[in-house]
Amino acid sequence: MLNDILSRVARVGAMHAGNRPNPPDDRPQPCRGKPPTSPGKTIKHKSFLGALAGAVAGALVAAAVAAAAVFLVGVTGGLAVAAVGALAVFAAGDLISAVTNKVSAMVDSASPAFGPVASGSGNVFVEKQPVARATKDTVACTKHNSPQLIAQGSESVFVNDAPAARIDDKTVCGATVKEGASTVFFGSGQGTYLDIADEFSWWEKALLIAVEFLVPPSRGMLKGLGKLFIRGPKAVLRGSRAGAKWIAGRLADKSSCASKAFKASSGLTRAKAAVKAFLKDPVYIASGEVIESRTDIELGQTLPLAFERTYRSASVHIGLLGRGWHDSWSEVATVTRDGLNTHVVITLAQGYDIDFTFHQDVQAVYCPHYPEFTLHRRGDGFSLWHRDQQTWRDFSVVQGERRLLSAIHDSHDNRIELVRDPKGYLRQVRHSDGVTLLLVWQGEFLHQIQRIDGGQKTLLAEYRQDEQGRLVEANATQAYHLYYDYDAAHRLTRWHDNDQTWARYEYDAQGRCVYTTCADGFLTARFDYLPDRVVMTDGLGQCSEFGFNDLFLMSWEKSPLGHVTRYEYDDYGNLLREISPAGRVVEFTYLDDTGRVSTFTDASGHQWQYDYDAAQRLCGVTDPLGREWGWMYDAEGNPERLTGPDASEVRFTWNRYGLLTQVSDAAGEVQARLQYDHRQRLLSATDAESRTRQLRYDGQDRVVQWQRADGARFRLGYRRASWTLPEQLIRPDDKEEQRQYDRHNNLLSYVDGNGALWRQTFGPFDLLTARTDAEGRTWHYAYDKESQQLTTVIAPDGSHWQWWLDADGRVIRERDMTGTETHYDYDEDGLCIRVRNGEGDTRHFLYDARGLLLRETAPDDTLHYRYDAVGRLTEVSSSTAHVQLEYDLRDRMVREWHNGTLLTRQVDDAARTVTRTLTWDGDADDTINALAPLTSLFHYTRTGELRQVQLPDGADLTLTHDAAGRESHRTGGSGFVQQREYDVMGWLTREMSGAQHDGHLLATQTREYRYDGAGNLTGVRHNRDAEGYRLDATGRVQEILSGGAGKPVDTTARFLYTRTGLPQEAGRLTEWQAGRLVQHDDTHYQYDRAGRLIRKQVVQPGYRPQVWQYRWDSRNQLRVVDTPNGERWLYRYDPFGRRVGKRCDQKAEEIRYLWDGDQIAEIRHYRHGQLIQRRHWVYNGWELVVQQRQHTGGDWETDFVTSSQNGTPQALFTPDGTLRWQAPKATLWGQRQAEKSESPDPGLAFAGQLRDSESGLCYNRFRYYDPAGGCYVSPDPIGIAGGESNYGYVSNPMCWVDPFGLAKCPTLAHGANGEILSAKATVSKAELRTGSGTNQSSRDYARSLGNQTDDAGHILGNVLGGQGGKGNVFPQLPAINRGQYRDFEKVVKDYIGQHGSVDIEWAFKYGNGGTRPTEIYYDVYQNGQKVFGRIFNN
């Protein structure tokens, strides 16, 4: 909702007044007369600043930068995420780092896509995919930290009261929807309902980045930001580029702008405000028009060169393509004279008209209704300035009263020329980036568009008209091949793609669409146009109502359940107030004449203030805490300097084309350098450690080669001349990977480096219907016809996971594959207020005006939450715990107090260090044991890699990285050394640990790794012992082979798997029921109605049964364990679900834990109330690297830890390099074959797992894992988001890990330098939103692999259940991490929410070598079929 509101605000000011609070992410967005888009569909940043429509690096960079800027400007999405989490967007990093990273990320972006559409309608589907809607749904733009609202949509088609989002529609961050349905088209005409960030303005991007810091963390705030940054700051920035003349004349000109268009159906403002009015296919309910809009071509590196076409059923216009069709190159100015006044009507590509009136001697007209447009006289022609896009449109070709479009250009002289013949026919389109298009005519209409620069003759689009001049076929080779049917009145009655998708329309006598339906019954609706409202009845008979004001802006909307949202506007259509159904109110004020937001007040009364300079550029922001951010600009209007509340600075350098070339800090230290070729395509990006990644392109500006800093090259191949998605990847090891897509850009199949084939099947509206893995297992998916939300997942064994929705499309009941049911209730605003589990335990939730959780009430406890003015969580309390949090000026958590323990952090940005101190109450008074606080100092490189840790006892651990940024050496104490080697793919091949003597390593532990073509681990040699793994096509272990020097090769274990992938070891009894383990050999398992293990019994002949009993609380936290020997262990947790203690009264023992984020930092062991031992742990990511032990009264003993590839500690070394302890052998699933109680043993299992000897389980942060059965003992807290199996661990524990017991995070395949090469994960619906944020340790680790300014980016996103530990992070540009990547994750989340579990695979490319990836390949599969994928530049 926030995203939608922001988008609407940005585009129209107040027109976005129709979004429902928290609309289902999977609801489709309204389409604009083009193929409707849906979750998972690709978005791209246009060549605004070089963002190639396809996947050119230059475009990527421009797109990335633009996206970042947009992201910041429209902070609509990113902030929303931050708000929801109650944490500042930049909580993980400083302002400078964040900004630098974002800019760098944008620059590094070389992928053809910037993320997917993240959400859609919950009840309207096209091609079985939820239809995305403008102003309501978001995209996961990899350039932003948060979801970005779709800002544009159909002008005539609305879905759930929101304009349908389609191909070519833009998001508030400036990205363009690139994919959509292949057979369905929604309402022509493109309405802009929210402000759109300038993709062309790099400096604006910087501003946007800054804005990110300003975005209030509340939902309401996010809404305001959308309006503010898109319409305000962005407009200001654009205005600055327009020049001082525009500023000087705006006051005199504004009064001359005609407002009649505003009230007429052709008014642009009306269209923007009506975005919300697009329902179902592309029906614009405000007028009843059907609007079909599509973008067939997108090219260009600087200025976006796009060909957009829009059909409007009520239009009599005849354009290049035929009757009723408008297009980008047919925009025209129509001039009429009335005495001394000159009236000019500008007709835009979306079919809208804007009226301007020039009085005598007036040279420029500014329209208060459309503050983004200013019209200037230019001799006999006119120039239209679009401040939001920072572009000029010249209308200088005279044809009677008409002035044809002749050029489009920006403030940096990037230019698109439209070359016409003497009769006015458009013959060529030439871009200053070097692109030339040839237009081929057939009679009076356009027949073909060909690209002819560089000697090529590539067909980009082909059209065919019937005898009556109506477009009947459109074949955009980069997008869709569509067919159109019309009635006798030339109104569109049907469109289809000759495949599975189609849409049909019926009209009344007034030409209004009264009925529409689509393939398979999706998006069916009937419209009744009443005098005071419009009533829409969907295919299930559910009614929604909408009211409009005199400006045709939605003034209220009523959901099927009767919830009413109201909107109030000023005379110019700016949104003043939005009142949710529950009465939550957000407010905006604006600067006179400019439409710039001056203040935003959230629902709790907290206010943000915005200041502008004389050029109307945003120059200052003040948040409710009084923190201030400021911007300074160069002579060209580019942002030159950004200053944060702590006086830190980020400086930017730009080239003559407006492209970012350098980012540096206040001291002049360069953080990133970017270089472009003569066509403004990004050629290379160099980070702060001088690691350079390089890109190469073909004649169509597609990336064909990416080179890491270490020289490794990845080559990309394309199936056909105009295809923009690479379908072939030749890796540095000469292995080939293949992908096959359909015309809708749906991934149909994927062949990995082993030749294993995964397949996917799609239905109407590109909804995934089946996924088959490489072993032939198939999952099927079913959807709700109205919301297109996933309602059923059918596993290969026939078991079902189902969801039931209410009339508003919200999940009210869920039943997993074991039959466990969960029920949900919501308030009027869509906030979940009750959850009831299978045992009948109910948890109640209360929220404040901002939608932030205030109280959680359960039968066994009540939690209270407090926040500061900007929405940061500051305090949480329960009956047994009290937590207080403090932040610095950059929103970094610097103090966490919990029941007597205190964790503090001191950050020195100049020195790139973080000092962590652990303190316990009472230690200062304990003079006997001298328990001093534990202080550790972490040092980082300029790119963020952990470089050194100085420990409390004076010892230190130093990490060294190679040219590719991979960890190559570790040295600690007086002699400990570890060396790592990598292959050409960057996968770790050898790791040697031991002592250093005379400059040489005397290794006592050597581990060598071998991989298959898909990057799966197939063998490990440990000293003289070797173990091999025979895998199936999906990478699961089938056999374990042992051997070694002088030893025969034996098969030590064989594994089979159920149809759903659960393990069954050959020769052993393993029984699963509906995905839950019920018997393993002699061990029997019993569960309660909530699906939690309550009894484990071991029955062996001749012995008494051994019984363990387990008791859980309402939050599914294990509280009590009764063991066979009569012991009872009690577990305690903090409000965040972290276990902070356990005790056994029978043994008089107690263990307490002090946490640093999601990792244990210190453990204290008490006996009879006396402290007997404590341990201090230091992590790098999820890998334990240092353990320190101290017995009461003794000295500290330091152990340097080496771990296996899955995070399991393998050995401990003394500071002099002597082997002190090595782990006993364990089974594939982690069960130790011989338990030893050696004191040095850290007691850790797989990454993130702490062994509990009393229960035989492993504490896994959010759940408990049973290594004997290889599964969890309670349902996944995040549901199907964690995978189709609610209890299963990972598919292959040698390659995958699950550090938090939530998502199935992959075990990372590392390269020779320690860089991450690949990762895999399975995410189910239950895992959604169960992830955790990064901690200082993981951030340090990520930066140790990359740059000091990098974010610790989640490989598997927080929203997907990914944890923030070292095992799930990598160095990532902030702009990408918080922008495109995060937006894409939301798309994935929405898809999972609708379609169920998915398998995710990542491949990391290192164009500059080192350990910092420059490109991330992110592919999502379902049932073996690739659902969608993206490539992220970094």
Curated annotation (Swiss-Prot):
GO terms for molecular function: nuclease activity; toxin activity. PANTHER family: PROTEIN RHSA-RELATED, PTHR32305. InterPro entries: DUF6531 (IPR045351), Endonuclea_NS_2 (IPR044927), PAAR_motif (IPR008727), Rhs_assc_core (IPR022385), RHS_repeat (IPR031325), T6SS_VgrG/RHS (IPR050708), YD (IPR006530). Residues 14-42 are annotated as: Disordered. It is a multi-pass membrane protein. One of its GO terms (cellular component) is membrane. It holds the Pfam family RHS_repeat. Keywords: Hydrolase, Membrane, Nuclease, Repeat, Toxin, Transmembrane, Transmembrane helix, Virulence. Its EC number is 3.1.-.-. Belongs to the RHS/WapA nuclease family. Disruption phenotype: A double rhsA-rhsIA deletion is outcompeted by wild-type cells, restoration of rhsIA restores normal growth in competition experiments. Restoration of growth requires the RhsA-specific immunity protein, rhsIB does not restore growth. SUPFAM superfamilies: Tricorn protease N-terminal domain. The chain crosses the membrane at residues 48-68, 70-90. YD repeats lie at residues 486-521, 592-628, 847-876. The keyword Cytoplasm does not apply. It comes from the Bacteria. It is found in: Membrane. Signal peptide: none annotated. Gene3D superfamilies: 2.60.200.60, 3.90.930.1, RHS repeat-associated core. This is Probable deoxyribonuclease RhsA. It is an enzyme of class 3 (hydrolase). It comes from Dickeya dadantii (strain 3937) (Erwinia chrysanthemi (strain 3937)).
